[in-house]
Amino acid sequence: MTNHRRVRKDCYESRLHDIAKTCAMKEKSKNAARTRREKENTEFCELAKLLPLPAAITSQLDKASVIRLTTSYLKMRQVFPDGLGEAWGSSPAMQRGATIKELGSHLLQTLDGFIFVVAPDGKIMYISETASVHLGLSQVELTGNSIFEYIHNYDQDEMNAILSLHPHINQHPLAQTHTPIGSPNGVQHPSAYDHDRGSHTIEIEKTFFLRMKCVLAKRNAGLTTSGFKVIHCSGYLKARIYPDRGDGQGSLIQNLGLVAVGHSLPSSAITEIKLHQNMFMFRAKLDMKLIFFDARVSQLTGYEPQDLIEKTLYQYIHAADIMAMRCSHQILLYKGQVTTKYYRFLTKGGGWVWVQSYATLVHNSRSSREVFIVSVNYVLSEREVKDLVLNEIQTGVVKREPISPAAQAAQAAQAAQAAQAAQAAQAAQAAQAAQAAHVAQAVQAQVVVVPQQSVVVQPQCAGATGQPVGPGTPVSLALSASPKLDPYFEPELPLQPAVTPVPPTNNSSSSSNNNNGVWHHHHVQQQQQSGSMDHDSLSYTQLYPPLNDLVVSSSSSVGGGTASSAGGGSSASASSSGVYSTEMQYPDTTTGNLYYNNNNHYYYDYDATVDVATSMIRPFSANSNSCSSSSESERQLSTGNASIVNETSPSQTTYSDLSHNFELSYFSDNSSQQHQHQQQQQHLMEQQHLQYQYATW
């Protein structure tokens, strides 16, 4: 029992000893970790103090920021191994501490911009604290990070090209070719030789525009687009060249990085900038066509504003500066703002002045589309070479530019086309005038009455009676406007009236004896009525005008001579018998055909293919009948052309039958008394055997 208790006691003490030992080891480990952290923090604090940053900033940096800034600073030492060196004019014996720092601070404040150094991989090795004034981003936030995180996506390819050396440098080592190393858009600066290493550095000038991220408030940010601001960057790309060591690899080139200064372009309030004595402003379209100049331009260049308007800016730029201006113009259209290089603006009378322009695309407040360009121009010099005229526009006398052969050929082709069009128009007008004259002559026919014959002319007014005409007396024909001529006359041409012939009264004639070569006409009684309705006073020719208006021929019995009547150039042969004849054509309202009978078996039939000018017979349309009120009569009207066909004549149909059918269909709404009167008139006229002899052509 006692031994058992002793064993338990020994185990308990051993366990306590182990626990104490473990606790001591843990305590020692904690102390070591604490000590290590303290030492680490101390080292980071010492490292932060070595950074070229104010103490107020370094005291608040975390470890990651200290490492990032330190790495960037060490890379900077490769670009500037000697720091400021002797370039600032200070002697080695002079205390350089606070004096140099104060000088650098004043330089940055005077710069009105920010300085930045970028490594070949895009890491920002250094950027001045003035970047926060222009971008709203702090120096600590930007340093050590990639510049591609803070520029527009469309500018990243351009930035890559700027940070890379020209390809021909690596292909042609300097020791072998002895060719200068440079860049197409840069200028090689004198190199600095390192006597210890036997190497030297070169500087390639770079000027470009970047759209960088801006987080400033809108009232302080100036002109921004989608959170990006245009920054004008100018600087140089540094490279170190190591000589050939004889191993066959040639010279070695090390890209050190880009050193540049960023300037903010004028804000969107560019139109509100106060113009000084050496400044003038203009507005232009997107193609640099000038649309406005302020009056100050006359004092600085000699031109009046009206002399410059509607001309392009390129006309007033020195030929050697046009390519640089073209590049600036492209940047302006692509990025919205640009600062041009110094260029020579040609002055009136000769010479030039040096000018630099700050141009901005001004947007319409109601839309996002670019409207015009506003440029503020700074005249930097007096007028130079006043007597040298480089462009005829400086003298105010502009010669016409020579026309290229292609332009001359195009002008000749246009002139030929215009002449052909004019000839075609004249021919069409002449044809139209001839056709109108032809129709007018056909309408305005003059008739000479054959002796021993009498013609009764029906007056145009309803209810008038015809009078016999004696031998040798001219015939007066009643005229009524033919509505079917409307579609064939121009609006300015007057409508020529159509002749309404009235047959003479001859009781001794018989329709049965004169069936060949004559038509029995019927419509005189319609003109002799005066009904209450408007269409009661209309003649048949007023309701259905003749198709060819009038073709009248007359002959004289004396000598058997011939007489010509106006009919569009047509002539009629006089018969030896001296019979007075007229040829009238009327539509058949029952069958749609025109029938004409004579001994030669000629008859009229509609042919839509016959030309109007050839057949001298115009088409008739039911729509031109202003008096037609019956749809049945409109369906019966024919609209084709009429032509003479030498065939066997069809069944004979007289106009008396046609007239009777027409009256029954058209005047069916009249009173029975009017119908009875019309039938009596028709019967009376049939008994009198009225006849018109219509001669064939």
Curated annotation (Swiss-Prot):
- GO MF terms held by the record: DNA-binding transcription factor activity; DNA-binding transcription factor activity, RNA polymerase II-specific; protein heterodimerization activity; RNA polymerase II cis-regulatory region sequence-specific DNA binding; RNA polymerase II transcription regulatory region sequence-specific DNA binding; sequence-specific DNA binding
Q: Which GO terms describe its biological process?
A: adult walking behavior; axonogenesis; brain development; determination of genital disc primordium; ectoderm development; locomotion; positive regulation of transcription by RNA polymerase II; regulation of DNA-templated transcription
Q: Where is the composition biased (Low complexity)?
A: 506-518, 621-631
Subcellular locations according to the entry: Nucleus
Its primary localisation, in coarse terms, equals nucleus
Q: What happens when the gene is disrupted?
A: Mutations result in the loss of the precursor cells that give rise to midline cells of the embryonic central nervous system.
> In what tissue types does this protein appear?
Embryonic nerve cord.
Annotated bHLH domain ranges read 24-77
Q: Which residues form the PAS domain?
A: 100-172, 266-336
* Residues covered by region (14 X 3 AA repeats of A-A-Q (approximate)): 406-446
Residue stretches of biased makeup (Polar residues): 636-655
Composition-biased stretches (Gly residues): 558-570
Q: How does it assemble?
A: Efficient DNA binding requires dimerization with another bHLH protein.
The molecule here is called Protein single-minded
Task: Give the originating organism.
Answer: Drosophila melanogaster
Per the UniProt record, the lineage of the source organism begins with: Eukaryota, Metazoa, Ecdysozoa, Arthropoda, Hexapoda
Gene of origin? sim
